[in-house]
Regions:
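Short loop/turn segments immediately following beta-strands, especially the blade-tip
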Residues: 48-54, 91-99, 205-212
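Short, solvent-exposed loop/turn segments at conserved positions within beta-propeller repeat blades
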Residues: 39-44, 83-84, 99-100, 139-149, ...
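Beta-propeller domain segments
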Residues: 1-8, 119, 136-139, 149, ...
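Beta-rich, blade/repeat-based domains predominating
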Residues: 18-30, 65-79, 83, 112-130, ...
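Residue position within the beta-strands of beta-propeller blades
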Residues: 34-36, 82-83, 130-134, 185-187
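A short helix->beta-strand "capping" segment at the edge of beta-propeller domains
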Residues: 1-20, 58-60, 243
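Asp-box/WD-like beta-propeller blade repeats and closely related beta-sheet repeat scaffolds
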Residues: 58-60, 65, 69-70, 74-76, ...
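A short loop-to-beta-strand structural motif that recurs across blades of beta-propeller domains
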Residues: 43-47, 79, 87-89, 150-152, ...
Length: 244
């Protein structure tokens, strides 16, 4: 931790220092920290609880095991949602059952089965819809734009699936603006072009079915070298910020 810098007035410390390949996390209503993992060998979802209020979690629970990249975790109305490569699972009243977790309810089981960029990030919006990142199945390729490279949303019951954004290579995190509820998300740019290009992106979704360019346009300005198209960036959403 001594290698990290924080702004004045902030401090950083360990909450859990023994977690197993954590990748995404969410707090429950009663303070349990749920952690999803990406590793093909870990395949677990954990919960950590600070029992004495000292801002250090002392107790670890295994919520489920032998799952397919259970990366995405989200929480709504007392229930934990876990998003694997292909499915959305729900664990009801989970904070009351940490030491004996229930069998999950399959909410949705039609996410595309492809391991590359197959770890899903997920979060609930203020509209109580579950938002899920579905990455492209490659470093750079053409693919079915209705199946891959998407930000999806659905109801908490897995119904009314909608495409919120297209042309997204690999988002590894997103959140909602507390006032506008616009969805802000990262997108990792393609490899094997140069050290600095194309940029990784910070993007914003303020309307449905927006196109963020991949695989033909990167960063709002750069036409792809493997799949060049005339006017490739026309009609696409430029990032709010490009990371070199």
């Amino acid at each position: 931790l001594d290698r990290l810098s924080v702004p004045d007035g902030f401090e950083i410390s360990y909450y859990v220092d023994y977690s197993h390949a954590p990748r995404s996390m969410v707090f429950g209503d009663n303070g349990a920290l749920f952690v999803g993992t990406r590793s093909p060998t870990t395949r677990l979802v954990y919960a950590y609880v600070d029992m004495d209020g000292d801002n250090v979690a002392e107790t670890e629970y295994i919520i489920d095991s032998d799952l397919e990249s259970p990366n995405g975790v989200a929480f709504l109305n007392g229930d934990l949602y876990v998003v694997t490569t292909t499915s959305v699972l729900r664990y009801d009243n989970i904070e009351d059952r940490l030491d004996n977790p229930p069998e999950p309810i399959i909410v949705y089981d039609n996410l595309p089965d492809n391991p590359q960029h197959g770890w899903r990030y997920a979060s609930f919006g203020d509209d109580n819809r579950l938002y899920i990142a579905v990455g492209a199945p490659c470093n750079i390729c053409e693919y079915n734009p209705d199946e891959f490279g998407l930000i999806l949303s659905m109801t908490a019951d897995g119904d009314d699936v909608q495409i919120e954004g297209r042309g997204v290579r690999n988002s590894v995190g997103f959140d909602f603006h507390p006032e506008t509820q616009d969805l802000w998300f990262t997108d990792n740019g393609r490899d094997w072009v140069s050290d600095d290009l194309p940029p990784d992106e910070l993007n914003r979704i303020s309307d449905t079915d927006l196109n963020f360019g991949f695989p033909y346009c990167h960063g709002g300005f750069l036409v792809d070298i493997d799949f060049p198209q005339d006017n490739a960036c026309e009609g696409t959403q430029a990032p709010v910020y490009g990371f070199p």
